[in-house]
Structures are given as structure tokens and as C-alpha cells.
Amino acid sequence: MYYADLRKYDTSNWSGINSTLFVSGCKHCCEGCWNKEAWNFKYGKPYTKEVEDLFISYIKDEHVVGACILGGEPFQQDLDIILHLVKRIKEETDKPIHMWSGYTWEELIKRDKCVDILLWVDTLVDGRFELDKRDLTLKHKGSTNQREINVQESLKRGEIILINP
């Protein structure tokens, strides 16, 4: 797995100061995507244990309120690596994890390994970016078809629970 960027202090993807990992590789190739360079699965640098340790250390910073994982497409990576990462974040920091995916909730919950990952995630912004539905006033997403899902409540209730309906 490769990553496109790693930010210790990021205020552009979620509320507050978060540490953010941008994974490389995405087959969705949404028209109007702002991060086209990250479509390439070999873009950026190799993701290593040292990179993961650094990311965890960023999240542990007292000023950081959570972790963001986006891309690229996190659910098109080696899912064992993503699962290991989200487990480590929760076990070592207990801070919220926010993930973005071009897949919908309905697509993700059909795949066991994706559900294993979601068990550790707090928020999922789901759905492909749609240029004709782009809205620059949206806070955590790029187009109106995307949803901010409370993952833990959705898993518990067996239905999608939106954060900002």
C-alpha cells in the first residue's frame, strides 16, 4: 500500500484538529475529483510500520481530536492493513476515526472485511463524488449525494443513522 499524504494537524476534512492519512489508489475515478493524483495505487510513498507509528504518534498529540482516513479509496487497499490501522488508533488513542469512501454504506456492509473495519470507525462519509451535485458549502463532503453516517449507531440499529440529515 502507498500513501499520498500524511498530515499531523489538519482542519480541512473534519471539525477540529485531526491527523489525516491519504491513501493512494482509487478505481472510482469520479469526474471532478480534487485528488486525481491519488488514483494511482503507486502514487506517493510506501506505507510502512514506521509511517503507521508516526501517524499514531500524531493522533496521540493532545491538540488532535481525531483521525481522518481518506484517499484515494481506503476500501480498495489491502484491507488487512486498514483493519490493523483502525484497531491501533482505537486501542492506543481512543479518539474518533472518520473515513471517506466512494462506496455506499449498502455496498460496504455486504463485504465482511469492510464490516470488520467499520466496527472500529465512528463516522463514514459514503458515496462517490458527483460533479453535478457538488456543493462547496458542505462541511465534510463534496456533493449532496454523499452521507455522513454514524457508523456505530448504524451497526447497532441495523439501519443508516445520519449525523447531519
Where are these regions (language model features)?
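Short Gly/Pro-enriched loop/turn and capping motifs at secondary-structure junctions
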Residues: 104-106, 129-133
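Short cysteine-rich clusters marking metal-coordination/redox-active sites
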Residues: 30
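P-loop/Walker A phosphate-binding loop and immediately adjacent motor/lid segment at beta-alpha junctions
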Residues: 77-86, 134-165
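Non-cysteine beta-strand/loop elements that form the S-adenosyl-L-methionine
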Residues: 120-130
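N-terminal [4Fe-4S]-dependent radical SAM core
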Residues: 1-22, 27, 35-41, 160-161, ...
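A generic structural signal for alpha->beta connector loops
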Residues: 94, 120-121, 145
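Conserved Radical SAM active-site core
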Residues: 1-4, 17, 35-99, 103-117
